[in-house]
């Protein structure tokens, strides 16, 4: 399996697992996984209602696997940093890009410091 396909599989597996586990503060709010293997986008959303009056909808985790073999973390709103979990799955730090940081800050992260 080539690196891009492997990274897509890892991203999908981690986010599917997250969509099925964990506890929500409000039972009426659910997690939804959205995966696009063709374009390499993997997202987790919160969807539902808080106290029947406040709509909850938003992406809290977005990974993008690019054709150059990098995993871009576009957003990580989790308590368990996805970058650490990717490293534990065998993804080298130089293949993980913090897309949510400005390009000039990325070189200080210890991870890849590329521009999109």
Name the predicted role of every residue range.
Residues 1-116:
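Terminal domain-initiation and capping elements
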């Amino acid at each position: 399996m080539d690196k891009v396909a492997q990274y897509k599989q890892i991203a999908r597996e981690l986010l599917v697992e997250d969509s099925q586990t964990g506890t929500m503060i409000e039972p009426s709010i659910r997690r939804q996984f959205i995966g696009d293997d063709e374009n390499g986008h993997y997202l987790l959303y919160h969807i539902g209602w808080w106290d029947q009056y406040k709509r909850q909808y938003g992406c809290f985790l977005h990974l993008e696997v690019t054709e150059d073999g990098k995993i871009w973390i576009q957003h990580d709103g989790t308590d368990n940093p996805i970058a650490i979990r990717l490293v534990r799955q065998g993804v080298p730090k130089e293949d993980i890009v913090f897309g949510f940081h400005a390009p000039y800050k990325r070189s200080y992260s210890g991870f890849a410091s590329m521009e999109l």
